[in-house]
């Protein structure tokens, strides 16, 4: 029921799929579930998760459930490891118990840390510099091990700076509180938000400041569907 997950639900519905939304609604929004079946449960509570999902059958799991604020992760590392890593371990435990065998993980380019090349590929070293990035890499490792030990397949998508809204304006990003770069930059430029600090002045650009890429959230949602179709 978060930003990227809700747009992925929308994309699934457009292709005729039925969905079940699993969320504890600590940051997600009920209005974003778009009338789909909802299971409200905390991934950190393995017992409650087992009870809520006992006997369920799903063709695949899209895993978006993770805390994602870099600064907060460095202040509260235990919270991020408990939520992101323990939560993923519990989800995979229940998946194996119920016979689900496909997962697409919402990972992050933060697993790379400070890049040593302009273009990031699969072989680029993974050296996250934030606790958030470390927990996402640990989530990837859990999936990798699960795939090695069980008849299970997974894809991890490493992205950053999702932006935009549904093309028909029916769905978009919740901005209270605002935590994402692009809306923050737009508000700063419009004079309706706090000034934005830009770090670095020696990049190979006209004014020496860095250039940030982004991906539209609808393209990102469709990428998740393509990844799941690949696993099928």
Named regions from a protein language model:
Residues 1-165:
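N-terminal Rossmann-like NAD(P)+-binding domain of SDR-like oxidoreductases, especially those catalyzing
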Residues 144-229:
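NAD(P)-dependent short-chain dehydrogenase/reductase
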């Amino acid at each position: 029921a978060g930003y990227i997950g809700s747009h992925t639900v929308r994309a699934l519905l457009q292709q005729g799929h039925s969905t079940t939304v699993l969320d504890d609604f600590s940051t997600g929004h009920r209005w974003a579930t778009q009338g789909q079946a909802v299971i409200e449960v905390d991934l950190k509570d393995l017992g409650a998760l087992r009870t809520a999902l006992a006997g369920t059958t799903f063709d695949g799991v899209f895993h978006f459930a993770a805390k994602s604020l870099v600064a907060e992760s460095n202040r509260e590392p235990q919270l991020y490891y408990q939520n992101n890593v323990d939560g993923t371990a519990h989800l995979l435990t229940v998946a194996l118990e119920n016979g689900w065998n496909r997962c697409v993980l919402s990972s992050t380019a933060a697993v790379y840390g400070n890049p040593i090349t302009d273009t990031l590929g699969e072989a680029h070293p993974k050296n996250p510099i934030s606790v958030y990035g470390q927990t996402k890499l640990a989530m990837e490792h859990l999936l990798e091990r699960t795939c090695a030990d069980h008849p299970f397949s997974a894809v991890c998508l490493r992205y950053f700076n999702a932006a935009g809204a549904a093309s028909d304006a029916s769905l978009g990003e919740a901005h209270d509180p605002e935590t994402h770069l692009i809306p923050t930059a737009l508000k700063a430029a419009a004079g309706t938000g706090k000034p934005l600090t830009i770090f670095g002045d020696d990049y190979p650009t006209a004014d020496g400041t860095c250039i940030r890429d982004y991906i539209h959230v609808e393209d990102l949602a469709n990428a998740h569907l393509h990844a799941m179709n690949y696993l099928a």
